[in-house]
Structure formats: structure tokens, C-alpha cells
Amino acid sequence: QTPLAAAGSATAVSDDLTGFAASACRVPLAESWLVGGASTTGANDLVVLANPGTVPATVQLSVYGAQGVSNPPGGSNLVVPPGERRVVPLAGLLLGEESPVVRVVASGAPVHASLQASLTRVLLPGGSDQVAPLAQADASLVIPGVQVLTTGEGQAGTVLRLLSPGADTTATVTMIPLDAASAAPEPRSVPLTAGLPTSLDLSGVAAGAYTVEVTATAPVVGAVWSTTGFGEGADFAWYAAAPAFSASGVIAVAPGVGASVVVAGGTSDATVTLTPVEGGDPLTATVGAGASIALPVGAGVYRLDTDAPVRAAVSYSADGALASYPLWPADAAASAVTVLP
């Protein structure tokens, strides 16, 4: 089969909803994690379940919050018919939760899960985003392209949310600046209690773009939230962990201002080439072991080739607009995937 890649973006401009959001199509999963959103006052977040298969899927939603894990009735035995999607308000699963993490388990057929997040602060829209899923908990997370832009008075402008689902552990958080001339902040240790989400303020560093790496002694899930500000015209993004990209594949860059492909190196240097599928000059760069680079790109489909494992994401940063989505390797051997609108 021929590998496929697709991505989309949207800008909301209304009295009660603003912001830029972008996301990529990816294969459905039997299990996934949604790290992001809230169910407190001002948040209007929706869990979206799509079934591109030919048989019904039955989905169980578990929510991790300040009191541990819960299995709310509104998230039990949710049937998603083939070729359709189902939307579940996050507040209907666990009301008043500041740092929820949702585990999605599907039987009968895999589903694609995502989180539509939007925020209002005292009647002032604070942005919107589409939160990408994680396939599984892992003892090592790499989150490329996080933009640290601002801090408000008494408010954190960039926050890492972590959860260790199964065991108490300690996570080490390292921030790697994309600007090679910038000094990296000191790594930080974060104790995690099993089943309880934990937030870490990352905004006390120099403004700029970073790759956030998390290592722990037990599997964890995590994502980073960042905002352009706390006033009129603000937007935010949730940055999800990216899986390893170890060979070649096609990727899609959705339309948007300030787009770049951010590549985080692994344990060895990697030469990365982006080649426009519809023609054009390839872009080749070397990313050092443990380093990160940003490759400015326009909208389109590209072939990504690398000679060593890397992690990558598409990141957008412009005035009043933030968005990001991780790049997953295309599985050319997988069965056909139908993309739902």
C-alpha cells in the first residue's frame, strides 16, 4: 500500500470562541490516553471518539483526577457505530477537575480519540486546541517544539502535566532549547503518586522553543500546555509526546502561520531530509544527539527520511496563535484507514 498522511487546521473568531488549532490524522487505537483540558469553570472540553471501522466499537473512559481514578457512568459502555463518531463532554465525566487525564479503551474495533479544548476567562475567550492522544504510557517521553512565551501575574504560562498510572515514581524533566546558543535549564525532579495527575510550572525559563524530555522509573503519560498570554486575543496549545520515527515516512503539514517541523535527536546524530511530495527542493539538516532543531516549512505533504531514530512534531507559533501535533510514522502495511470529518 501507499503511505498516506493528512492534517487540518482551523481558526475560530467569535465572541465566545477564538484560537488556532491543528491536528493530524492517525490510525485508530484499542487504547489511548488524552492528557489535557479541564472541567473547571470556563473550560468547554469535549472527548471525541471516531470509529473508522466496519463494526461497532464499545468504549470505556476512565478519568484520573485529584481523587485518583474513576469510572464514571457517562464514560461506560459507549457504543460508537462504524463510520461515526461520538462526543462526550469532559465535565460530564468529572466535574471541577483542573488536571484530568482520560484513558480510552475500545473493544470490538479501535477508535481515534481526541480532545477538543477551549477556554473562557471571565467572558473573554482564551483560545482553543485539538489535543492529540498518546498510544501508551512510557518511562521516557519526548515532547518537541514547546513554545514558552509568557507568564501572567500569579499565573503559569507553560505547564507540564504528568501521570504515573500504575506506580509511585520520580520523573526527571529536562528542557532542551532549540536555540543552540541558549543555556539549558537545570533538570528538575518531580515525585509522582500512582493515579494522581501532577502539574509542574515550566514558565520560569527564558522565552523560546524547547523540547521537553521526561524520564521515570515507571511508565508515565504527559503533555505540556502553553499560552500566548492571558488577555484579549490569547491562544493556547497542548503539546503531546511524540513516538520514535526511525526510518522513512510521509507527513502532512496543515496550513498555518509560523509552521515548522521540530526534530528531536536520540542517542546518536541523525541526518534528516524533508522532501515535498508534489515537487520542490528537499531540505536536509543534521540534528545532534540529544539536541533539537526546527525546520520552517509550508503547508503540504512531505517525505521524512532519517538515518537514526528521532522524535518530531509540527509546531505553529504566531501572534495570537499556537498549535502543535506529534508526527507518527506511517504504517504502509496497515489496513486502509477512513478519515472522519
List each model region and its residues.
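Hydrophobic, ordered structural segments
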Residues: 1-19, 48, 52-57, 79-126, ...
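Long, low-hydrophobicity ectodomains and other hydrophilic envelope-associated domains
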Residues: 1-8, 261, 272-274, 304, ...
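Conserved functional hotspot residues at active sites or interaction interfaces
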Residues: 9-48, 112-166, 221-268, 311-341
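Extended, compositionally biased repeat/scaffold regions that form elongated interaction surfaces
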Residues: 24, 106, 129, 138-166, ...
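Intrinsically disordered, low-complexity linker/loop segments enriched in Gly/Pro
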Residues: 31-40, 54-80, 88, 139-150
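Short acidic, flexible loop segments centered on an aromatic residue
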Residues: 49-70, 106-107, 154-181, 216, ...
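Intrinsically disordered, low-complexity Pro/Gly/Ser/Thr-rich segments with frequent PxxP/GP/PP motifs
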Residues: 68-101, 181-209, 277-301
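C-terminal beta-sandwich/jelly-roll accessory domains of carbohydrate-active enzymes
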Residues: 218, 268-269, 276-286, 291-293, ...
